[in-house]
């Protein structure tokens, strides 16, 4: 479903900022920095072997098949309705889990700033409150959501710029907190935090989100490739710059997953500095912006699937006044609320553990859908060669196959490291991995039941409608 009233509201600048807001996740910037100098080498590898292929694949699909459903539409064209519904179900419902992770992070920052030692039972109502604030924003008119994503992108640039510059200034006066040597730049399975490499891969996914906003894009054939190029360059540059700043200001064993960004600027400006407080508040607002972006676009794709009878009808409900996917976004709110309660219990009093567990779980679900998304690209190249492609990946079939295999390989590695972050060192922490494995099995099983029942109900409705039609 689309809105003609809202058509053409996002040009190249808005699409660029939307992608920046969607892709840059401040909470995972610290995970990237936790890799130490070896993370810079991993970033270089990821840029060449994942970012560039990913950028070209999304540009070709987004300009060839511009539609409200985004990856749902692409996978449906390639592999059929049921497979596309499985993918978009994971893509969509996992954002309810990510919503919980995001706001666990937000309340952790609030606690660190205003109430150190705030117990989790106090943080939980705040998490739930932020979840339903996000749902209310998404259910309102689309211009508000777009405005929040643009503002969030600007705030992220300010925050990462401040952390990067602040860390470098601190290092100039006091020395570099994290030693940089030739040996430290070489990744190894024994490197501290090597499991966080999955966060680097996740950090550079999400550019395809904007394709779910098909009805509000201005001339996507022209604007989307430009915006994806600009935003890809900005995202990679900001992540590397911010990671460098954090490493220069903090030793690796002092980088906190929840408060690492604000911790990096405290040594320069002081704990009680107004600048630290301003950056902290901007950080909080960015987290809300993250969730609006990551919930708004997939909810549209899920609503499109529900419209075709592949998900429950309630998911396909659109707001009668604002034409927003209120059914899908409200469902995400309930998922996020349930997950917040569960993961607060699992955290056993540690906010950082709660964030990383929920983040790993949601990220595994989200990027699992990419295992169908990338093959859909090569399948459509083979099965639909006659469709005009305003942007076509250069290099012919060989390049298309190589890029697809590279992207699938990186996603597979990220999934393994999210679930088993210590596997490269030969150990498995089942306290971390167990809930993710069980959760994935549960979500996949529930999804299969929901999809098949939705298909049966839709078929029954169509049959009844045909029987009632006068011959």
Enumerate the predicted regions with their spans:
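C-terminal membrane-solvent junction of multi-pass transporters and transport-like membrane proteins
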Residues: 6, 151, 314-323, 367-420
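Membrane-interface "cap" regions at the ends of multi-pass membrane proteins
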Residues: 1-58, 67-68, 181, 386, ...
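Hydrophobic transmembrane alpha-helices that form the core helical bundles
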Residues: 34, 53-131, 136-139, 284-301, ...
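A generic transmembrane alpha-helix motif of multi-pass inner-membrane proteins
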Residues: 357, 361-369, 395-471
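Helix-loop-helix connectors at the membrane interface of multi-pass transporters/channels
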Residues: 1-4, 72-82, 103-126, 159, ...
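TM-loop-TM module centered on a large, flexible mid-protein loop between adjacent transmembrane helices
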Residues: 73-74, 80, 112-116, 227-292, ...
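Membrane-interface loop-to-helix entry segments
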Residues: 122-174, 205, 228-233, 359, ...
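Helix-loop-helix junctions that connect adjacent transmembrane segments
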Residues: 6, 40-41, 117-118, 122, ...
């Amino acid at each position: 479903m689309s809105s003609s009233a809202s058509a053409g509201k996002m040009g190249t600048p808005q699409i660029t900022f939307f992608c920046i807001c969607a892709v840059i996740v401040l909470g995972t910037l610290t995970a990237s920095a936790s890799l130490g100098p070896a993370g810079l080498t991993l970033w270089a590898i990821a840029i060449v072997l994942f970012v560039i292929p990913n950028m070209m694949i999304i540009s070709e699909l987004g300009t060839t098949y511009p539609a409200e459903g985004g990856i749902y539409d692409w996978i449906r064209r390639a592999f059929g309705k049921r497979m596309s519904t499985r993918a978009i179900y994971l893509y969509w419902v996992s954002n309810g889990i990510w919503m919980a992770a995001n706001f666990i992070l937000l309340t952790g920052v609030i606690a660190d700033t205003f109430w150190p030692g705030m117990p989790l039972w106090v943080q939980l109502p705040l998490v739930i409150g932020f979840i339903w604030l996000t749902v209310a924003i998404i259910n309102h008119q689309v211009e508000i959501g777009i405005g929040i994503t643009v503002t969030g992108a600007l705030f992220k640039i300010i925050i990462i710029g401040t952390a990067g510059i602040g860390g470098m200034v601190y290092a100039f006066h006091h020395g570099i907190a994290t030693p940089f040597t030739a040996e430290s730049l070489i990744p190894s399975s024994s490197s501290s935090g090597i499991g966080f490499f999955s966060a680097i891969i996740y950090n550079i996914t999400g550019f395809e989100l904007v394709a779910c906003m098909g009805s509000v894009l201005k001339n996507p054939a022209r604007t989307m490739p430009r915006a994806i190029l600009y935003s890809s360059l900005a995202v990679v540059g900001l992540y590397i710059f911010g990671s460098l700043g954090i490493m220069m200001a903090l030793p690796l064993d002092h980088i906190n997953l929840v408060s690492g960004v604000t911790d990096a600027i405290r040594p320069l400006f002081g704990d009680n500095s107004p600048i630290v407080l301003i950056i902290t508040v901007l950080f909080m607002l960015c987290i809300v912006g993250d969730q609006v972006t990551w919930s708004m676009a997939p909810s549209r794709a899920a609503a499109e699937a529900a419209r075709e009878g592949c998900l429950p009808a309630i998911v396909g409900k659109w707001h009668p006044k604002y034409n927003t996917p209120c059914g899908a976004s409200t469902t995400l709110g309930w998922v996020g609320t349930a997950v917040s309660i569960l993961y607060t219990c699992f955290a056993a009093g540690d906010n950082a553990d709660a964030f990383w567990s929920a983040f790993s779980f949601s990220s595994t679900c989200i990027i699992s859908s990419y295992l169908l998304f990338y093959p859909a690209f090569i399948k459509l190249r083979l099965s639909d060669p006659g469709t005009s492609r305003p942007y076509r990946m250069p290099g012919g079939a060989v390049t298309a196959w190589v890029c697809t295999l590279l992207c699938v390989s990186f996603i597979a590695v990220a999934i393994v490291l999210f679930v088993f972050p210590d596997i490269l060192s030969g150990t498995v922490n089942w306290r971390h991995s167990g809930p993710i494995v069980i959760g994935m099995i549960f979500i996949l099983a529930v999804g299969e039941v929901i999809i098949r029942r939705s298909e049966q109900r839709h078929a029954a409705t169509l049959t009844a409608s045909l029987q009632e039609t006068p011959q």
